[in-house]
C-alpha cells in the first residue's frame, strides 16, 4: 500500500522542480544529490522523500503538463501551441475537398452563418452516432448470473 506524502514534501519538491528543472533527471540518486546541493534539508529521511517525489513528478512531466507546476520550458511550449497557425485554413474550401465545398454538420453551418461566413459553400452532412463499445467487466469477464 502507498504512503501519504506530507505537505512539506509536496511543496518543496514543486519549488525545486520550478527553479531547477534543467538540472533534474528521472533518476532518484541524481535528484537526491541535487537536492543536497541546492537546499538545506533537516534530515536524510526528509531529503530522500523530497528527492523521491521530485523524481515521481519529473516522470509525470515527461508524459505531459502537471497541474500546479509551471516552469519556463513548459510555458514556452504552451505559448508556441497558442500561437500555432495552420498551413491551410479549414475554411479554405478550394484545397480541402474535391467538390469545392466544405463538409459540415448543421450546427457548424449555423455557426458559420452567425459569424458572417455564409458566403462559403457548404455541404451539410448528417452526424452519425458512434455505437458505444461494450467493455469487459472485471473478474475474468464472466457473464453475469442473473
Swiss-Prot record:
Pfam families, per the entry: Ribosomal_S17e (PF00833)
GO CC annotations on file: cytosol; ribonucleoprotein complex; ribosome
Listed Gene3D superfamilies: Ribosomal protein S17e-like
PROSITE patterns: RIBOSOMAL_S17E
Subunit structure: Component of the small ribosomal subunit (SSU). Mature N.crassa ribosomes consist of a small (40S) and a large (60S) subunit. The 40S small subunit contains 1 molecule of ribosomal RNA (18S rRNA) and at least 32 different proteins. The large 60S subunit contains 3 rRNA molecules (26S, 5.8S and 5S rRNA) and at least 42 different proteins.
Physiological role: Component of the ribosome, a large ribonucleoprotein complex responsible for the synthesis of proteins in the cell. The small ribosomal subunit (SSU) binds messenger RNAs (mRNAs) and translates the encoded message by selecting cognate aminoacyl-transfer RNA (tRNA) molecules. The large subunit (LSU) contains the ribosomal catalytic site termed the peptidyl transferase center (PTC), which catalyzes the formation of peptide bonds, thereby polymerizing the amino acids delivered by tRNAs into a polypeptide chain.
Protein name in the entry: Small ribosomal subunit protein eS17
Amino acid at each position: 500500500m502507498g504512503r501519504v506524502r506530507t505537505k512539506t514534501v509536496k511543496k518543496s519538491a514543486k519549488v525545486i522542480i520550478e527553479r531547477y528543472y534543467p538540472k533534474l533527471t528521472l533518476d532518484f540518486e541524481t535528484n537526491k544529490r541535487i537536492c543536497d546541493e541546492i537546499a538545506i534539508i533537516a534530515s536524510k529521511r526528509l531529503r530522500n522523500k523530497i528527492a523521491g517525489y521530485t523524481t515521481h513528478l519529473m516522470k509525470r512531466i515527461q508524459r505531459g503538463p502537471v497541474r500546479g507546476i509551471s516552469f519556463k520550458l513548459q510555458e514556452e511550449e504552451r505559448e508556441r501551441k497558442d500561437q500555432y497557425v495552420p498551413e491551410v485554413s479549414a475554411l479554405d474550401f478550394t484545397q480541402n475537398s474535391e467538390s469545392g465545398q466544405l463538409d459540415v454538420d448543421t450546427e457548424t453551418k449555423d455557426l458559420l452563418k452567425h459569424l458572417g461566413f455564409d458566403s462559403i459553400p457548404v455541404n451539410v452532412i448528417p452526424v452519425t452516432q458512434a455505437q458505444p463499445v461494450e467493455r469487459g467487466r472485471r473478474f475474468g469477464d464472466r457473464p453475469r448470473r442473473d
